[in-house]
């Protein structure tokens, strides 16, 4: 259990170093762009899926 605590402590220190530096701002900007990109893709595929359902295929 102590090893897990040490691993998470190291991860927290690395995250703090990134957070207090300027990397967090750049990462947040990239995350916003990716969020809207995948949101648009989701809406497009949702519409395509709803329009593509025309009933069961003929047998």
From Swiss-Prot:
Major localization class: membrane
TM spans (from-to): 5-25, 30-50
Location of this chain's protein in the cell: Cell membrane
Pfam families registered for this protein in UniProt: DUF1328
Topological type in the membrane: Multi-pass membrane protein
A GO CC term attached to the entry: plasma membrane
Sorted UniProt keywords: Cell membrane, Membrane, Transmembrane, Transmembrane helix
Coiled coil: none
Lineage: superkingdom: Bacteria
Membership in a protein family: Belongs to the UPF0391 family.
Protein name in the entry: UPF0391 membrane protein lpg2521
Provenance organism: Legionella pneumophila subsp. pneumophila (strain Philadelphia 1 / ATCC 33152 / DSM 7513)
């Amino acid at each position: 259990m102590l090893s897990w605590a040490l691993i998470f402590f190291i991860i927290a220190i690395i995250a703090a170093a990134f957070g207090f530096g300027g990397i967090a701002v750049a990462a947040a900007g990239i995350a916003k762009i990716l969020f809207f990109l995948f949101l648009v893709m989701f809406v497009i595929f949702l519409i395509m899926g709803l329009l593509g359902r025309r009933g069961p295929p003929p047998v």
